[in-house]
Amino acid sequence: MTKFQEWPDEPIDLLCGGTPCQSFSVAGLRKGLDDPRGNLMLTFGAIGAKYRPKWLVWENVPGVLSSNGGRDFGTFLGMLGQLGYGFAYRVLDAQYFGVPQRRRRVFVVGCLGDWRSAAAVLFEQESFKGDSSARWGSRTVHPCLTAKGARAFDDRTGYVLEEQGIRTTTPLEHERLMGFPDGYTLLPGKRSPDTPRFHALGNSWCVPVVRWIGERIEQVNRILESR
C-alpha cells in the first residue's frame, strides 16, 4: 500500500479498502495517527488523490470515531474534503445482514463532488422511519382478562460441548460467520493451517455488508448516469 506511487497510472472507478484497526481499537494502545499502521489511513487518501476515482469506500473499527478525541477521524474526513469528495459515514453491524455475529464497523463512502450521492448509498429512505414492532392481527375480544402468550418449545441455542469443555470454533465456521463460501480460505493443492486462515478471516470484511454497499453504489450510480 505504501508503494502506490509505483502502481500503474490506470483510471479506476472505485477505490475500496480498509487500514489496520489496531491503532484505533479500544482494545489496543490507541496511538492513532502516531502509529505507522494508523497513518495508513492518510495513505489511503493519498491513493485517492493519485487516481481520483468517482467512488471511495473505507472501513475501520468504531474506535476510530473517538481516537484522539475524534481528531484522527476528522483529519481523514478533512483530507477527503480537500480532495473534492463529498462523503458520508455510518456504523454497520454484520448481525443485521444475515450472519450470526455482532461485528460493528465504520464505513465511509465518498463520491467525487457529491455528498448527497455518498449519503444515498449508506442511508436508505426507509432507515429514517425507524423500526416498529410487527402488528398482531385485528381481533374483537370480550372486555375481560385474556391469557398471556406462551411457547410450547424452547428456541434457545444449545451448547456444543467436548469432553473437556466448550470447543473452539473452526475455520469453516469462521468462513460462514463472515459470509464466505465454505472452504474459501483453503489453498488448492497447498497445506492450509488453521492459524493463517483465522487471521485472514479476522482481518476481512463481512461479505454481505460489502455486497450491500456495492449494490447501493451501483443503484445510485445508475441514477446519476441517467440524468
Predicted regions and their residues:
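Class I S-adenosyl-L-methionine
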Residues: 3-14, 21-168
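Short, hydrophobic/glycine-enriched beta-strand segments
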Residues: 14-16, 179
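C-terminal target-recognition/interaction regions appended to catalytic cores
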Residues: 128-227
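Short connector loops/turns at beta-strand edges and beta->alpha or beta->beta junctions
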Residues: 20-22, 182-183
